[in-house]
Amino acid sequence: MVNLVCDAIIPDGPMKDVEEIEKSILTTYKKSIWSKFLKAINDFDMIQDGDKIAIGVSGGKDSLLLVKLFQELKKDRRKKFDFKAVSLNPGFRHSDLDNFKNNLDKLNIECEIIDTNIWEIANEKAKDYPCFLCAKMRRGILYTQVEELGFNKLTLGHHFDDVIETTLINMFYAGTMKTMTPKVPSTSGKLELIRPLIYVKEADIIDYTKTNGIRAMNCGCTIEAGKTSSKRREVKDLLAALEEKNPGIKQSVFNSMKNINLDYVFGYTGGKEVE
């Protein structure tokens, strides 16, 4: 049976002091998180001097970590850039929103929260499957707001496992070879989307979150009550089973997106449909 419920991350204890959390990034998680974050930025030339970067913050484990990493990067001063955390409130419950704001306060994160009624609209217009419309609306509003605020880049918290799962979802269910790229222009062309966590494994993000006592938002959706995509869950469970029997499977899938031999595929469409 496929588990359709988002896995809750239960902290090991109360949240640690922000100074201790920040120190852990450069000590305990230097190899598994910090170094991989820096490597992705350098490998894909994600940040240039003068950049104005918005960090999309959902309140979940990935985006909360991402902001802390950028705070540490800013201290380095080798790259001259500005950044700001930006979050959409699609209609969170008061308790979830309060927890989110409490996390921001304790983690010393300044974040602009933009209130919307996305969930209400998505549920009214697409009752059977509101998730697709919700995601589309959230992207559209976030991109527009970030552009209007004068940013030229938007940072998203997608990690190593997101890349692998997306690759297989596209293969299994859409019949296409496509994945999340480290950086890509937005549809309007006014923004560049960057993913500095692309080398960071979800298990390490979970460990960082639990160990530091961060009660990150799990799934604040008031409509689907914690359910996640059945396709993504199927792929996640499949990968876990394969990785247990054959350690390195995930890395191989990830590497495959960097090693496509066009001489040995049926056709290359360049984003266009094959006739």
Predicted features by range, described:
Residues D82-F83, D161-A241:
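Catalytic subdomain that performs nucleotidyl-dependent activation
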